[in-house]
Amino acid sequence: MSKAAKGGAGGVEQVVKLIVGAGQASPSPPVGPALGSKGIKSMDFCKEFNARTAHINTGTPMPVRVTVRPDRSFHFDVRTPHTSWLLLNAAEAPIGKGGKRKGASNPGKEVVGTVSLKHVYEIAKIKQSELRLSGLPLEGLCRAVIYQARSIGINVIP
């Protein structure tokens, strides 16, 4: 009896979502255990990921979707950093206790930084380079970035 007939994950592709610093993938947690449990050699992933993200500033948190096939081969898509991370860095928001930049506690009343429309446009261009967002108009992406900025306490100035 095959694994699929027994109810195992025999013929199904599995997806693992990770956030890894650009150029900083290593077999240690969180990468190693997440991929090891699916039967993937984490060192192979780390070498390929670090090669693909070599042109990006080291440490930039990159969302990754790893698709694991039933034969234990894999492929992965590296996505653009989260919009909030890009905005907080552009606004040079203060660094919180955990060593990460943090948005406002009360976004309507508190402001942690400001960005210009040029920053918004550049962030929208970065996001548009992602395959799933490539069909959206740049104006719509700019509006989404502006709304995201307001929701984390960043003012947008013309």
UniProtKB/Swiss-Prot annotation:
Protein name (Swiss-Prot/TrEMBL): Large ribosomal subunit protein uL11m
GO cellular component terms, A-Z: mitochondrial large ribosomal subunit
GO molecular function annotations of the record: large ribosomal subunit rRNA binding; structural constituent of ribosome
Function: Component of the mitochondrial ribosome (mitoribosome), a dedicated translation machinery responsible for the synthesis of mitochondrial genome-encoded proteins, including at least some of the essential transmembrane subunits of the mitochondrial respiratory chain. The mitoribosomes are attached to the mitochondrial inner membrane and translation products are cotranslationally integrated into the membrane.
Oligomer and partners: Component of the mitochondrial large ribosomal subunit (mt-LSU). Mature N.crassa 74S mitochondrial ribosomes consist of a small (37S) and a large (54S) subunit. The 37S small subunit contains a 16S ribosomal RNA (16S mt-rRNA) and 32 different proteins. The 54S large subunit contains a 23S rRNA (23S mt-rRNA) and 42 different proteins.
Organism: Neurospora crassa (strain ATCC 24698 / 74-OR23-1A / CBS 708.71 / DSM 1257 / FGSC 987)
One example of a Gene Ontology biological process annotation: translation
Pfam families in UniProt: Ribosomal_L11, Ribosomal_L11_N
UniProt main location, coarse: mitochondrion
Cross-referenced InterPro entries: Ribosomal_uL11, Ribosomal_uL11_bac-typ, Ribosomal_uL11_C, Ribosomal_uL11_C_sf, Ribosomal_uL11_N, Ribosomal_uL11_N_sf
TM ranges: none
Family recorded in the similarity comment: Belongs to the universal ribosomal protein uL11 family.
Subcellular location: Mitochondrion
Signal peptide: none
SMART domains reported for this sequence: RL11
Record's keyword terms, sorted: Mitochondrion, Ribonucleoprotein, Ribosomal protein
